[in-house]
UniProtKB/Swiss-Prot annotation:
Reactions catalysed: a 5'-end diphospho-ribonucleoside in mRNA + GTP + H(+) = a 5'-end (5'-triphosphoguanosine)-ribonucleoside in mRNA + diphosphate
Single GO MF annotation: mRNA guanylyltransferase activity
Active site: K66 (n6-gmp-lysine intermediate)
Compositional bias of kind Acidic residues: 441-455
Name of the protein in question: mRNA-capping enzyme subunit alpha
Cellular component terms (Gene Ontology): mRNA capping enzyme complex
UniProt-listed Pfam families: mRNA_cap_C, mRNA_cap_enzyme
CDD domains tied to this protein: Adenylation_mRNA_capping
Gene: CEG1
Main location as per UniProt: nucleus
Signal peptide per UniProt: none
Amino acid sequence: MDSRDAPEVPGIRQPANVTTDLKMIICKLLNSPKPAKTFPGSQPVSFQHVDIEEKLLAQDYYVCEKTDGLRALMLIIMNPVTKEQGCFLIDRENNYYLLNGFRFPRLPRANRKELLETLQDGTLVDGELVVQTNPATRLRELRYLMFDCLAINGRALVQSPTSSRLAHLGKEFYKPYYDLRAYYPDRCATFPFKLSMKHMNFSFDLDRVAGSLDKLPHVSDGLIFTAVDTPYTVGGKDSTLLKWKPEQENTVDFKMILEIPVVEDDTLPKKDRNRFYYNFDVKPSFHLYIWQGGPDVNTRLHDFEQPFSKKELEILHRTYKVFAELQISDEQWAKMKALEQPLNGRIVECAKDQETGEWKFLRFRDDKLNGNHVSVVQKVLESISDSVKLEDLEHMIPRIKARWEERKSKKRTHSSISGPMLPPVAETKAPREATQSRYIDDEDWSDEADDDDEDSLKRARIE
C-alpha cells in the first residue's frame, strides 16, 4: 500500500441549504449564468508528446511541482447579517466545509493597523491541501498551497491571464495574510493551518523544478504546466493546463468491488437461508470498475460493508463497467482486513505495472465520490503508451527558451512601434531557484523596514 494518503478536509461540512446559498454566491462572484453543479475548479489534461510542439513551444508557460495532496478551493466571504467573515473549503465533490479560526485582512492602504480593521470579502482561491514536514520543527503539519485566484474582494479574475491572477493572489491576499502573522502573531493563534504560495518558474526551468521534487517537504508526483496568458477555465477541463507525471506515476482511480466466495453448508436443510454464506476468511476477487457518468449506486462508503446484492449490481452497471482485475497479495489483503474498515465499493488509486500489465493498489481515495470517467481512463492509458519522459522534456529546453525569447522580443518591438509612451516600470524579481525546496513564504512578501518603526528591522520569521 502507498503511504501517501490524502489529508482529510478539515472543518464542518455544510448542510444542503447552506451549500446551495454558497454556490449562488460563487455564481454571482464569477459572473456565471447559473450555479455550478460540479467542482468549480479547472482540471488539467495529461501531457502528451504533441503538447511539446503545440503548446510548450507555441506559448509562454509556467511550471511548478504537482503536489500529491487534496485539491480544494477556498472561499472567503462576509456574512451580511452577523458581519463576520466566513472561510470555506470546497472539495472536488463540491462539498463545502466551514473553517473556524481564520482571519484574512485586506491589503492596507495607509498603515498596518488596517490589518486588524479590514477583512477580505468575496475572495476565491485555488490550491491544494497537503500534509508536509516542517523543515524547521520536523513536525508533520497541514498546509494549503495556493496556485491560482478566481476572485479577489468581489472582483472576478477568471478572464484575466494567469500572470495577472497570480499577481493579485500574491499582493492582495497572501501579503496581508503574511503581514498579519508577522506583526500580530497573537491574533493568528487560532488559524487551523498555514498557507503558502507555490513557486511558478518559467517553463525552460523545468529541469530544475523536476530536480527539486525529492527535496520538497511533501510528496510530489510530477509537474504542472500553466499557460501564462490564458484565462481560468471554471468547472471543466482546460486543454492548456498540462499535468506531466513519470510513467510509474500515471494512475487511475477505480471503484473496487469485492467478489466474496460463497460457501454451502450441506449440513443445513436446502431451504435454510443460512445454507449459503459468504466466507470472509478467504481472499476475495477484486474487480476494478470505471465510471461512465451518472449517479452512483450509493453515496456513502459505510453502505458497502456487505457484498452487493444482485439488484445493487444491476444499478451499479448503469453507471459503471468492469475494466480490469486488481492483483492483491496475501500480505496486502491481511493489511486491508486489519484496517477494520468497509472495503467494498471504495475508490482506489492504482498504477499499471509496465512489465506485467497488471494493476497494483496504491491507496484509498475517500476524497473522491466516483472513480475516473471512462474518458479520463482512456487519456491516462494514452499517456502511458505515449509516455513523455523527463529526458524528452529536458532535450527541448533550449528550443523552449529560444521561442520564449523570440516572443519577448516581438512584444518589445511591437510596443515600441505602436504602444503609447509609458513611464518606466521596475523589473520583476526573478523567481527563486527551483532547486531550493521552499515555497513563497513569509519573507518573500515582507516590506522594507519603515523608518519610524523600531522593530521592523527584525520582522518575525514565521515558517
